Amino acid sequence: MMKISLEFPKSETRLAGFPYGETVYKEQVKNIISFDGDIEIIFPNQIEKVASSFVQGFFSGIVAVIGYKGVEEQIKIVSRNDNLTASIRKNM
């Protein structure tokens, strides 16, 4: 399983905005991701809330390659708690 740990400034606890999500994907994920197997995307513990706009922007590049079904089957989300993880997955 490929593991990708996202990085944000320590003071950043909430993520929002479609363009910001796209930027994070392009800068931290796009050049290293391989869709050949399962992928674990790890949000740092300081992240408390992730808006649907960020989720949609971040995952738009992934969905374009493997589709929503591929995201459901291949992508595992790890965050500070199960509620946040469920929220991120729901907002894809």
Regions inferred by a protein language model and the residue ranges of each:
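Domain-start "cap" segments at the beginnings of catalytic or binding domains
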Residues: 1-13
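Amphipathic alpha-helical interaction surfaces in cytosolic regulatory modules
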Residues: 11-28, 34-37, 43-89
